[in-house]
Amino acid sequence: MLLLISGSGITYFAFERFSMTHVFEMFTVSFLIWNSVRFYKNRNNTSGFLIPLSLLIAFLVRMSNFYVFLIPLIIKNLVKTRHRKKFSLLRNYYFIGSSIISTYFYTILSNKIYGKIIFNPQEVYGTNLSVDDVISNENSLLGLFIDIFRTSFKIFFGNEFGIFWISPIIFVGLFLILSDFKNLRKPFNLLLLMCFAQNFAIVYIWKSTAASYGFRYLYSLVPLCVLIYFQYKDKKINKYLLNYALIMSIFSNLSILFFETTEKTQLSTT
């Protein structure tokens, strides 16, 4: 697990871009997953109380990450499938009480910072661009598909921060889900695809070097992709893809090391 996480690009943000939110995104999403697993597996009331607080912090760190609200449902379906346990989060009094407290704190913080309660991140980021706007700018359906293909190719295999090279666990997580045709319609897989779809839509809308060609906005998916990796590792499916994740994680660590110690790179230490 340490190799997969270190090879996800975390060292780049932890040691060179620590002022950005991405390391905090990974922590909050991981914390949310951990609490969700503890609750649904052991009915841990402390975790039931911490789940709404985890959601609050994760949403405040990056308000465009709406998918975090799907994570408790993803874990619920995972635990239900693997351990045959059914615990209702919505009926847990600790969860209900914490949800009320978290909602109250969010309204206070939002009013203090923005002067009103905000749920639309576009109001924070100062943009009104949407997927519909991007699609309507294309002259034809063929042009739209070509543009999506070009963007996807750059996200996966771009020379700068292509996730195939720099964050193999994200690449593997997505393709493990897509290649599992037998279970593609199951709630666990569908919810995970929704998480990927939301982040990829954001990347498609804002195609720029400032977004590291999508890597920055996909990075918060790393904890979920690690979860996917171990879910399929137990099933012994796609061994070559799983081995690729381990090998390329080593390459990712080395590539970031060379990137940060080369004189002509943007964040060179010399």
Model-found features: residue ranges?
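Hydrophobic/aromatic-rich transmembrane helices and adjacent perimembrane loops
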Residues: 21-28, 61, 67, 166-171, ...
